[in-house]
């Protein structure tokens, strides 16, 4: 029996470093940032959910279900992940940010292989040097644990997954896969890179 894997694209943040612009909707090479992310992950998953706390109507135009955080107050990636976990029946949920337009085309396969090889509950991506806490594959059954962690006042996703059996999938062969956009300067650099990928 093949596993069902859904994805959530996290676009629920405040984007303070981008001058408050909604990062998923910032244009990059003629497309909204989130469109690049969708193109990368769509062939790898069954359903895509978008977590957004503003501009929901605009995000809905991409043709996917848009979910706002159940926990209000812009509480970060944990809140968006918890919300998505409550809206999927899949075996695993892929979590990615909206501003990583160069995500690996084999992201799911390698995260899943890491889970299976280590009998883990979730796998986190690494660029070969640093873990990427908001790029992970996890079981939706972990929702209760994540909710309790958030409601205890915690926000850091890596502190949460450290409490579980987690594996790391290294993508040292794709060092730019997780480059994201936090400043207009990074956006310019990334635009050039996308043209070459």
Curated annotation (Swiss-Prot):
Gene3D superfamilies: Spore Coat Polysaccharide Biosynthesis Protein SpsA, Chain A. The N-terminal domain determines nucleotide recognition and specific binding, while the C-terminal domain determines the specific binding to the target protein. Keywords: Cytoplasm, GTP-binding, Magnesium, Metal-binding, Molybdenum cofactor biosynthesis, Nucleotide-binding, Transferase. This is Molybdenum cofactor guanylyltransferase. Mg(2+) binds at residue 99. One of its GO terms (molecular function) is GTP binding. GO terms for biological process: bis(molybdopterin guanine dinucleotide)molybdenum biosynthetic process. Transfers a GMP moiety from GTP to Mo-molybdopterin (Mo-MPT) cofactor (Moco or molybdenum cofactor) to form Mo-molybdopterin guanine dinucleotide (Mo-MGD) cofactor. Its cofactor is Mg(2+). It catalyses: Mo-molybdopterin + GTP + H(+) = Mo-molybdopterin guanine dinucleotide + diphosphate. It holds the Pfam family NTP_transf_3. It is found in: Cytoplasm. GO terms for cellular component: cytoplasm. Monomer. HAMAP family: MobA. InterPro entries: MobA-like_NTP_Trfase, Molybde_CF_guanTrfase, Nucleotide-diphossugar_trans. Its EC number is 2.7.7.77.
